[in-house]
Amino acid sequence: LICVKEKFLFSETTETCPDGQNVCFNQAHLIYPGKYKRTRGCAATCPKLQNRDVIFCCSTDKCNL
């Protein structure tokens, strides 16, 4: 499985997930209205929601754009 680690305007950085991590995630944490900090990568399971977070999980290559 290949997940996006960072996304830029015209490019992206990817990572190959190790054995046992078969989920890609895209987590957006609200810093203040209109401003989010995004975290992307591989995980064994979908991360738990925390206060003011939005999380998207998927299991195909580069699905966490």
Curated annotation (Swiss-Prot):
GO terms for cellular component: extracellular region
Write out the annotated subcellular location.
Secreted
Q: In which tissues is it expressed?
A: Expressed by the venom gland.
Xref: CDD domains: TFP_snake_toxin
Which species expresses this protein natively? Naja melanoleuca (Forest cobra)
What does it do?
Answer: Binds weakly to the muscarinic acetylcholine receptor (CHRM). Does not show inhibition on GABA(A) receptors.
Tell me the leader sequence span.
Answer: none
> Mainly localized where?
secreted
Q: Which InterPro entries match?
A: Snake_3FTx (IPR003571), Snake_toxin-like_sf (IPR045860), Snake_toxin_con_site (IPR018354), Toxin_cobra-type (IPR054131)
GO-annotated molecular function: toxin activity
Q: Which UniProt keywords apply?
A: Disulfide bond, G-protein coupled acetylcholine receptor impairing toxin, G-protein coupled receptor impairing toxin, Neurotoxin, Postsynaptic neurotoxin, Secreted, Toxin
- What is the name of this protein? Muscarinic toxin-like protein Tx-NM3-2
SUPFAM superfamilies per the record? Snake toxin-like
Its assembly, as annotated, is: Monomer.
Family of this protein: Belongs to the three-finger toxin family. Short-chain subfamily. Type C muscarinic toxin sub-subfamily.
